[in-house]
Amino acid sequence: MSLFITFEGGEGCGKSTQSKALYRYLKKKGLGCVLTHEPGGSKSGDKITRLLKWSKEEHISPLTELLLFNASRSILIDNVIKPALQDGKIVICDRYTDSTLAYQGYGRGLDLDTVKCVNSLASGGLVPDLTIWLDMDDKAALLRKGELPPDRFESENNGFHQRVRNGFGAIYATEPDRFLKLDASLPQSEIFSRIKQRVTILLGCRNE
């Protein structure tokens, strides 16, 4: 039974922690499951990620970001996500098209319809069955990152991160049925309990 689940949110909201926890939980239940992430998730995609996050040699415009993120996405979908879904597996992806719309559209100010069009082209119209949005105050979330050196996006000003958060809110408002919105400031155990509950319901519906 194939299922496509994505995790979304700003920097430091706990997406990686919760996506890994869900992956381990589903594997223990004996379900075929694949855990991946954006940007990257493939050898070629990881090279693009390093350019996007850490390059300081050349200016990378918002449009270039949009195109590079979607080039990485297209590779990931063709080589990881689609094959796994075709095999009837559950795919968990840390970030997907909503992040691009929130960051490059709302955050960077690119035309939203253009971002949606490029996203759709690169993804082949593949839409998640469930998107888990971990929402948190951007300042508090960035404090979670600790003393690790910030990448190009983490080092952006508070205004940028607030626009990104508002962007996720706008996306959620247009497709609330696809989303599970959670307060990322809650204890990790409580967040995961709510995720398990929603995924269990979704799995039950798919098995009927």
Curated annotation (Swiss-Prot):
Instruction: Identify the GO cellular component terms for this protein.
Output: cytosol
* The keyword Glycoprotein is assigned to this record: no
Broad EC category: transferase
Name the Gene3D superfamilies for this protein. Answer: P-loop containing nucleotide triphosphate hydrolases
Function of this protein?
Phosphorylation of dTMP to form dTDP in both de novo and salvage pathways of dTTP synthesis.
What does the UniProt keyword field contain?
Answer: ATP-binding, Kinase, Nucleotide biosynthesis, Nucleotide-binding, Transferase
Recorded hits in NCBIfam families, A to Z, give: DTMP_kinase
Pfam families recorded for this chain? Thymidylate_kin (PF02223)
Q: What is the official name of this protein in its record?
A: Thymidylate kinase
- Which HAMAP family does this entry report, sorted A to Z? Thymidylate_kinase (MF_00165)
Family assignment from sequence similarity: Belongs to the thymidylate kinase family.
Which Gene Ontology MF annotations are present? ATP binding; dTMP kinase activity
Which gene underlies this protein? tmk
Q: Which residues bind ATP?
A: 9-16
The leader peptide range reads none
SUPFAM superfamilies this protein is in? Answer: P-loop containing nucleoside triphosphate hydrolases
Could you name the domain of life of the organism this protein comes from? Bacteria
EC no.? 2.7.4.9
**Alphabetized InterPro entries for the sequence:** P-loop_NTPase, Thymidylate_kin-like_dom, Thymidylate_kin_CS, Thymidylate_kinase
| Enzymatic reactions | dTMP + ATP = dTDP + ADP
Q: Which GO biological process entries does UniProt record here?
A: dTDP biosynthetic process; dTTP biosynthetic process; dUDP biosynthetic process
